[in-house]
């Protein structure tokens, strides 16, 4: 009875032949192969090239995004100095806020020092925000041929870039007057001020630091608004001076030349009159007894000068007129001798 039950159990189970088991084994291998190919295909993009990891992308490896080919952003160092200190400045009151805001809104133009003085003098240091390394760098993002390359400039303070701020084209950096190594950065929205001071490194010469600040100024002036208060103050002083009127000056010169010519003509006419009216020399024996001795000497000395210099032109006509009038007034006192000195 037990043997019959055991036989029925074995007959109820499905029996797999040898060929069927071989087919199942082959199917299992093919499914594993197709799964591995699918995994490899997921690591490739549409063009068949493998997709790179994040580290490869950071190193500037090319890739395709939305069908457009582009390169990763690149960092270009512009300037670096290892010893600066930066203070944050705030306004010392609200009296000059309107005048200062007008100068801030006029970004893109050079602000003269007389407008900028109130902005500087009404600031006070609040706190030290950084000391150490100052760096200027540029981030370039290349694009496809049909797009323009994008660039952005930044200023970094401290080691490792503890404080980073973008440098926009309208940012204003001012070199303070009578200060070779101090600069004021004016931020807007919100309104803030940084004063950067370049400090000497041990053993560094003054001229060497000047060369470094000159390099800093040349780079800053190419990426934003740079103002040198020493130069703008000199320009404002020159502009305040009234320029000479060339037309009036020329007219004055012509008038002086014409007046001098007329005076020369008058001198010539009067000298000719003197030469045409010669004074006769007569014996002065009787005159010497009638006229006082001192007055006679004056007459003789005066007449001698006139006779000796009558042949040349005097540069001063009033001198002749004065002497003639003096002689005539003197001779009016002696009517009997007036004809001799007329």
UniProtKB/Swiss-Prot annotation:
<keyword id="KW-0472">Membrane</keyword>
<protein>
    <recommendedName>
        <fullName>Inheritance of peroxisomes protein 1</fullName>
    </recommendedName>
</protein>
<feature type="region of interest" description="Disordered">
    <location>
        <begin position="1"/>
        <end position="60"/>
    </location>
</feature>
<dbReference type="InterPro" id="IPR024758">
    <property type="entry name" value="Inp1"/>
</dbReference>
<dbReference type="GO" id="GO:0005780">
    <property type="term" value="C:extrinsic component of intraperoxisomal membrane"/>
</dbReference>
<comment type="function">
    <text>Required for peroxisome inheritance.</text>
</comment>
<dbReference type="Pfam" id="PF12634">
    <property type="entry name" value="Inp1"/>
</dbReference>
<comment type="similarity">
    <text>Belongs to the INP1 family.</text>
</comment>
<feature type="compositionally biased region" description="Polar residues">
    <location>
        <begin position="41"/>
        <end position="53"/>
    </location>
</feature>
<dbReference type="GO" id="GO:0045033">
    <property type="term" value="P:peroxisome inheritance"/>
</dbReference>
<keyword id="KW-0576">Peroxisome</keyword>
């Amino acid at each position: 009875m037990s043997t019959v039950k055991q036989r029925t159990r074995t007959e109820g189970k499905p029996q797999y032949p040898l060929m069927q088991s071989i087919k199942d084994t082959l199917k299992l291998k093919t499914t594993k192969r197709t799964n591995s190919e699918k995994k490899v295909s997921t690591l490739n993009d549409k063009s068949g090239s493998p997709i790179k990891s994040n580290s490869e992308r950071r190193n500037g490896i090319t890739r395709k995004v939305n069908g457009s080919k582009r390169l990763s952003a690149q960092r270009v160092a512009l300037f670096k100095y290892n010893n600066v200190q930066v203070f944050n400045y705030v306004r010392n009151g609200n009296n000059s806020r309107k005048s200062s805001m007008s100068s801030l809104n006029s970004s893109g133009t050079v602000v003269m020092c007389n407008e900028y003085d109130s902005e500087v003098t009404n600031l006070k240091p609040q706190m030290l925000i950084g000391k150490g390394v100052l760096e200027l760098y540029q981030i370039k993002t290349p694009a496809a041929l049909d797009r323009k390359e994008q660039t952005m400039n930044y200023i970094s303070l401290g080691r490792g870039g503890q404080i980073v701020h973008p440098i926009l084209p309208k940012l204003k950096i001012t070199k303070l007057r009578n200060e070779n190594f101090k600069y004021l950065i004016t931020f807007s929205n919100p309104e803030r001020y940084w004063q950067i001071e370049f400090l000497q490194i041990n053993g560094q010469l003054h001229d060497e630091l000047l060369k470094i600040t000159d390099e800093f100024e040349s780079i800053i002036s190419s990426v934003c608004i740079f103002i040198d208060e020493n130069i703008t103050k000199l320009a404002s002083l020159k502009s305040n001076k009234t320029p000479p009127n060339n037309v009036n000056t020329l007219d004055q010169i012509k008038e002086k030349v014409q007046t001098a010519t007329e005076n020369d003509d008058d001198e010539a006419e009067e000298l000719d009159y003197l030469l045409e009216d010669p004074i006769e020399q007569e014996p002065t024996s009787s005159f010497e007894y009638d006229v006082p001795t001192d007055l006679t000497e004056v007459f003789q000395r005066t007449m001698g000068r006139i006779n000796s210099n009558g042949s040349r032109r005097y540069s001063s006509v009033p001198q002749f007129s004065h002497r003639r009038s003096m002689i005539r007034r003197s001779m009016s006192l002696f009517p009997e001798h007036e004809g001799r000195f007329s």
